[in-house]
C-alpha cells in the first residue's frame, strides 16, 4: 500500500500481473503497461491500491467508534453514558442496522443491546457481557423479554428465531419455522424446476419447487447453498448451465462447473470509482443470454457473459454520495422483453431513466412524475411490461421520511405521462410489481404485508389468497412453463 516508485519498479512483472488479475482490473491493463506508466510518473503504486477500493469502501475502511449506551433518569431531560469501557465489536460500522436497547420489565438495571452479537448488563449499563453463544446466528435485530418471566427471552436475527429460558446463558433455535430473508428470486426450466434466491446473510440458495422433496424420487433436492455472503440478484442461463449470483455491494460472480469467476465491472485508474447499491441490480438479457447488464451509478453492458464490460450511460443519479453508506446508486433495472435495448433504470435518490436505443440516449422521465409525491423517493421497482412496448410500472419507497404510503405509477408512453395506480391499496410500502406474463390484465404487487392482485390493469386491487402470513414480499416471479406464482419473502 505504501510502496514507493523505486520499490515498485523492481517487483517481478509476473507478481504485478497476478495482482492486476486478482483485483479485477480491466483485462487490457497489462503489467508491462502499468510498469511503464509508473516509470513515466503517469501512475503511482498508491493509485493502483486506491483503485481496488470503490466508493463503498467508506462503509468498511473507517475508524470505528465503539457502541455507546446512554441512559436518562429524568424522562429524557438529560442523558449520561453508562459505561467507561469501550463496547467494541458489537455494531462495527453499521449500528443503524440493529439499534435495539431493551430493558427488563421487572428490573430497570438489566439491559440488553443488539448488534452482530448480543450483549447484556445487570448493573444499569456499567458493565456488559455476551448474552449469546455460537448456536445463535449473528446480527440480532429484535428482542422480546417475557414480562412475567424475565429470563425467558426470544431474539430475531438473520438466521431466524432463538429462545432462552435462563437470561441468555443457553439458547435453542426455533427452527420449526422455515424463515429466511429473501431479496430476490429466480427459476430455471428443469423438471421439476428449481427456485433460486439471494438471502440476507445466508448466501444464495437453490431448491426444488416440488412438494415431494422428501420422497425418494427427489431425495437430496432440498435447499442447498450455492454461494455465500449476503445473497443478492440471481440470473439463470439454462442453455449454458450458468448461474449468475452476487453478494452485497455489487460483487458479482458467474458459477459453472469450474471455479466461480468474479465478473464485477472494473474501472480504470483515474476513472470515477463505481458506486454500487447494497442490492446492486444485475440482469441477464431476455433477448440474448450472453448479454448482461449491471447498474451502479452508471449502467454497464457485457456481450460475453460478464468477461468484458462497457459503460452505456453516464452517471444516472444526482451524484450526491451522502454519508458512509453508499448512496446515489441504481436500485432497479429492467429490459423490455419486446424490444432489445429498451432499458429502464431507477435510483435511490428518486430518478427514473429510459433508453430505447441500447444506452446511446437516456431520457430522465422522473421529471414527468408528480414531484410533490415522488421527488427523492427510493425506487423500489421499475419494470417493463411484457405485453406493451411503451408501458412500464414504477413503485417507490419513502421509508426515509417515516412514510409507508403505497407509491405506484404506470406509463403507457415511455414515461412521457404517468398515472397513479395506488387506488384502493392500503398503507403498505410496495417492494415489487409485475404483470402476469400471459394475461395482460393481471398485475401482481408485493408489499411489506403481503401480495395483491389486480385483474383490470391496476384499476383496483385485492389481496391474493388468505394463507400467506403477514410478511414482506420482496420479489415475485411467474414460472413461464408451469404458470406458478413464486414469492420471495423477507
Feature names for model-found ranges:
Residues 1-490:
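Beta-propeller blade termini and top-face loops
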Amino acid at each position: 500500500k505504501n510502496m514507493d516508485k523505486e520499490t515498485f519498479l523492481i517487483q517481478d512483472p509476473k507478481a504485478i500481473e497476478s495482482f492486476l488479475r486478482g483485483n479485477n482490473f480491466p483485462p487490457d491493463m497489462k503489467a508491462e503497461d502499468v510498469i511503464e506508466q509508473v516509470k513515466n510518473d503517469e501512475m503511482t503504486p498508491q493509485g493502483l491500491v486506491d483503485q481496488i477500493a470503490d466508493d463503498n469502501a467508506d462503509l468498511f475502511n473507517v475508524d470505528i467508534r465503539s457502541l455507546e449506551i446512554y441512559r436518562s433518569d429524568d424522562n429524557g431531560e438529560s442523558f449520561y453514558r453508562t459505561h467507561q469501557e469501550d463496547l467494541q465489536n458489537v455494531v462495527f460500522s453499521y449500528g443503524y442496522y440493529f439499534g435495539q436497547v431493551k430493558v427488563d420489565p421487572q428490573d430497570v438495571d438489566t439491559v440488553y443491546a443488539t448488534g452482530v452479537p448480543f450483549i447484556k448488563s445487570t448493573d444499569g449499563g456499567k458493565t456488559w457481557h455476551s448474552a449469546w453463544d455460537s448456536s445463535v446466528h449473528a446480527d440480532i435485530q429484535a428482542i422480546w423479554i417475557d414480562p412475567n418471566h424475565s429470563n425467558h427471552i426470544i431474539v430475531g436475527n438473520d438466521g431466524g428465531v432463538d429462545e432462552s429460558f435462563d437470561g441468555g446463558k443457553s439458547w435453542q433455535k426455533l427452527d420449526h419455522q422455515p424463515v429466511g430473508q429473501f431479496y430476490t428470486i429466480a427459476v430455471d426450466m428443469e423438471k421439476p424446476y428449481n427456485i433460486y434466491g439471494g438471502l440476507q446473510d445466508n448466501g444464495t440458495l437453490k431448491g426444488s419447487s416440488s412438494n415431494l422433496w422428501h420422497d425418494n424420487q427427489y431425495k437430496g433436492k432440498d435447499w442447498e447453498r450455492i454461494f455465500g455472503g449476503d445473497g443478492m440478484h440471481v440470473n439463470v442461463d439454462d442453455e449454458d448451465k450458468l448461474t449468475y449470483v452476487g453478494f452485497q455491494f455489487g460483487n458479482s460472480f458467474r458459477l459453472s462447473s469450474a471455479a466461480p469467476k468474479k465478473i464485477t465491472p472494473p474501472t480504470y485508474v483515474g476513472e470515477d470509482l463505481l458506486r454500487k447499491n447494497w442490492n446492486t441490480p444485475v440482469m441477464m438479457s431476455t433477448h440474448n443470454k450472453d448479454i448482461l447488464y449491471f447498474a451502479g451509478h452508471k449502467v454497464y453492458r457485457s456481450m460475453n457473459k460478464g468477461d468484458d464490460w462497457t459503460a452505456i450511460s453516464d452517471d444516472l443519479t444526482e451524484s450526491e454520495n451522502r454519508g458512509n453508506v453508499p448512496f446515489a446508486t441504481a436500485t432497479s433495472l429492467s429490459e423490455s422483453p419486446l424490444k432489445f435495448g429498451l432499458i429502464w433504470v431507477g435510483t435511490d435518490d428518486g430518478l427514473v431513466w429510459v433508453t430505447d436505443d441500447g444506452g446511446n440516449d437516456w431520457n430522465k422521465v422522473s421529471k414527468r412524475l408528480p414531484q410533490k409525491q415522488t421527488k427523492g423517493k427510493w425506487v423500489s421497482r421499475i419494470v417493463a411490461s411484457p405485453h406493451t412496448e411503451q408501458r412500464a410500472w414504477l413503485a417507490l419507497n419513502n421509508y426515509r421520511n417515516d412514510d409507508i404510503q403505497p407509491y405506484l405509477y404506470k406509463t403507457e408512453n415511455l414515461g412521457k405521462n404517468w398515472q397513479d395506480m395506488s387506488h384502493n391499496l392500503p398503507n403498505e410500502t410496495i417492494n415489487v410489481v409485475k404483470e402476469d406474463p400471459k394475461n395482460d390484465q393481471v398485475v401482481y404487487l408485493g408489499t411489506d404485508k403481503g401480495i395483491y392482485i389486480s385483474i383490470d390493469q391496476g384499476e383496483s386491487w385485492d389481496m391474493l389468497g388468505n394463507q400467506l402470513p403477514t410478511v414482506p414480499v420482496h420479489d415475485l416471479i411467474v414460472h413461464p412453463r408451469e404458470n406458478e406464482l413464486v414469492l420471495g419473502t423477507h
